[in-house]
């Protein structure tokens, strides 16, 4: 059934009239450019295409192992949890809830879905589309509420598993409240390393700009910390980053309102960073002008602050530098080849290991064979790590895993592996039908 529903829904989202409707609806509630909002619709449509026909059935493929006597065999099954809950954030009003909701349904669960109330109209409309495509209305419960009400519902209803996508603070509270019966895709302070091989300067500058400032930096995968190898110091990379950032404007929402930080709080953070010895403002650091954005939201120009590497790793500075600002903001630093162990130490100390990028086509750098301790990929744990000249931190499509690593509570999204990990558990059933040997007798007690 769900293969058929997916096929019909994928077809609907492929229609220009429907995709434009959802793109515009996303823009109404989430400050994104048209192209960024359309990206959500596109990924969602492709995800649904991936699970048409028998692909849903294949998700639940089991296996059998012969036993140790005639008539015995064990069967391993992917088993649904049953009653589950899904809580999703404001920054991807369509993509995250649809991919997680459908994953839960594909594996046979009964979900209650809560989307951030600021943007929940998008998913309300999508549910109506799914109902029109054959989704039984009783298969999904959809709730609009504040966080406190949802927390009470979770504690009283006691779902067997809850998927939470959102802030680390709320994630840790829920993990305690729900006694660990939770999967998390929470905050990411995501880093990018530019390796020693300098090439394709314009392309790499553009990707850095997209990673840091698309959707006004309000992605859990947004580039938060950029490490630039000293070989790039002779290039115009920083000036190109500045030029790209300055062409973003409120009129087309290539920069826009920040929904979880005020302008004052973001600028206060910038000023604190500028008190660190050797730090400097590379660009931005000013409020947007000529707008009517309410003061409860943030509105600043795309901003980058340089902080020396040796200052970043100092205990008194590290927590400040690695504070996630969910807005158009990033830290930039540089490093020498001999300082790579310091860079790796800084990465290891981070608590959120979501996305990362190692921008280099130098295989010795990617695997870091300088010394055992100098490993880049081998000494990091980010669940979605891009490596190579075109490496990025954002823009994950539907065709590869997206999620953190290094935490047993970590959730993935989009792929068969992610769906099976998050929305099912392993159950083993051992069939032992005999026959009992003809000469069997009751043995001595043991």
Residue ranges and their predicted role:
Residues 132-134, 157, 169-316, 338-341, ...:
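ALDH superfamily catalytic-core signature
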Residues 34, 74, 116, 143, ...:
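Hydrophobic alpha-helical scaffolding
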Residues 48, 123-126, 153, 174, ...:
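Hydrophobic packing residues within well-ordered alpha-helices of enzyme cores
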Residues 1-73, 116:
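N-terminal Rossmann-like NAD(P)+-binding subdomain of aldehyde/semialdehyde dehydrogenases
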Residues 79, 99, 137, 177, ...:
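Short, solvent-exposed loop/turn segments at the edges of secondary structure
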Residues 92-94, 119-120, 149-151, 170-171, ...:
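Flexible loop/turn segments at secondary-structure boundaries
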Residues 1-7, 115, 135-137, 238, ...:
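Conserved C-terminal structural/oligomerization subdomain of aldehyde/semialdehyde dehydrogenase
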Residues 27, 58-204:
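Rossmann-like NAD(P) dinucleotide-binding subdomain of oxidoreductase/dehydrogenase enzymes
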